[in-house]
Amino acid sequence: MGVVMNGYTRLLLSGLLALGLVQAPAQTGEPVPAPVQPPVALITGSDRGIGFALTQELVTRGWKVIATCRDPARAQALRDYAAAHPLVVIETLDVTDNTAIDQLAGKYHGQSIDALINNAGITGDFAAQRLSALEPEGFQQVLRLNAYAPLRMARAFLESVSASRQKKIIAISSGAGSLFTAPQAPDSYYYDMSKAALNLGMRLLQNDVRGRGVLVGIVSPGPVDTDMQKAYRANAAQVGKPVTMPAITPADSARGLVNYIEGLGADKAGRFWSAYTGQEVPW
């Protein structure tokens, strides 16, 4: 039954509502809407560079971020940021450790992850990647982290991604993985081959998960001013193939990447795009 209120009662209730001391009663027959939950992203390699910038940009846009890295104790900037931003949760994860991947996936089993962002990667020792110095151990290390680990992460977290609203798996790739641009690349066999393998692996993954409604994004962040980019440019200069494209800041790259992630649809899924140019990359 509804409550009949006189003028005094209405005035009193209005005052209490304004002070936040009472909540407005639900109207008869009108369900109270559930609070909207923020989208959730899990990022690998969140302690520095592009990963840390992605964490900040996503939080700015209202995302909850599960920020992972190998050693949070050494990630002071990330820990300080998380302490000031409740939307950030830090988790320890070495993406080359399958057991650690499965344990973290088990921890979040039953929880939705809108965007699984595979950002962690390495360049490897460039001096060991020249034709005269090739050896299998170094190649296996770079290939495992850059190409295999994102697939392993996708397998482990597929149920959480499939249960989400956005259903996105993102691979942070590189223009170095494009066969089209390979003639201009420096002598960095392991790194370039690993990124080409990542691109193909993600394209095959898209075929596998399309029936679940999952979208797989393959994206280059552009020439970002990070430690990896500095090492890449130094090696390129040594072999006489200097990189002349000006570098951009991690924050600028993160804005482009999040624009790409939020705008990812079926038309771009399984294809290689540049967040720097906003165009598809031939590969």
What are these regions (language model features)?
Residues T96-Q111:
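Conserved Rossmann-fold cofactor-binding substructure of NAD(P)-dependent oxidoreductases
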Residues A82-T99:
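Rossmann-fold cofactor-recognition segment
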Residues R61-Q76:
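Conserved glycine-rich Rossmann-like NAD(P)H-binding loop of the short-chain dehydrogenase/reductase
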Residues D47:
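Conserved glycine-rich cofactor-binding loop
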